[in-house]
Amino acid sequence: MKTLLVEKNKIRANLETVKAKAGKAQVIAVLKANAYGLGLREMAQLCREASIRRFAVTEPEDAVRLRDWGFGEEEIIVLRSTANAQEIQQILQSGATATVGSYDAALALHGLAESQGMVCDVHIKVATGMGRYGFLPTEIDRILSVYRYLTNLNVTGTYTHYANAFKSVKKTQLQLDAFLSVVEKIRAAGFEPGMLSASNSEAMFGCKTDNLDAVRIGSALGGRVIAKGDHGLQRTGRLQSEISEVRWLPAGCPVGYGSAYVTKHPTRVAIIPVGSADGYMVEKARSSFGFKECFRAACSAMLSFFRRRKYYVQVNGKRVPVIGHVGVNHTAIDVTDVECGPGTVVQLDAAPLFVPASIPRQYVD
């Protein structure tokens, strides 16, 4: 049996840290990707208990789920701009706030809302550096057309998303400047941009940019941010499993794929039925980062080739080393000096985001 242990007391502490760091800015809890693997429903409840009443999701169906679970008073912002009729219907059905990132998406949303006699709240997305959803700063006329002609859309906010907050304050500030320039043009035309937001977890904890009216915080809720320094956040999410088999191996016996580890002396080895398929030892692709991060990763990999980095798990309160490469479904550990056997509980650190939803989440205080 495998479970992901989620410590609610750590999440509660993180929520208070986030609120304090946000200052006067509203906190929008980003609960996309099953709340970064921590569990959408449970995280929404913890946020509600912390008086955070604005949620953001990526998938319109998540907005429907939250409403069905009783989150009827909270504002739910769908962060993905869409022109898909089925997804638009889910947004309208749930009373969520839609993201409008193109005039085509705005037209599609307006048309369906108008046909049903509805007015949909929307946030305008401005693309200042991500290159995904959003109006380009040069498309100010299209943004203003949303205000002028699409009367079934009610603009309640405007936002952008930082691409480099985890590594470049300068680039982040340039994005903010570009965003605020668009905001000023909206106001100069006689329209209100509504609630302004730009900062994500990395920006709020790693940069000194303006928090504006609201911050959108996701990964920090689980205590996992790339930004350097001690931010007062507590990491949560531990895989828990049981030892399936214990055996003695003689000296000179290889362990795992590639024979990367060879026993130097008789070794008592335990097998845990947990591997990369369960999210253990899985991290974001290095291609999502810059040259410096990739260079550091390459150096680390080269160093590991000559001097293998050690990883540990917890067995009966003791740190036990992982030996050999982690497999898809199995991990070997050295338990020569640890009293344990089949059925002994083992805890492993894993980013909840990569732990499959099929593995139950167990919430503990």
What is the predicted role of each segment?
Residues K2-E7, R12, D104, L176-D365:
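Active-site anion/phosphate-binding pocket segments in diverse small-molecule metabolic enzymes
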Residues K2-V6, K10-A13, G23-S197:
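Active-site-proximal beta-alpha core segment in soluble small-molecule metabolic enzymes
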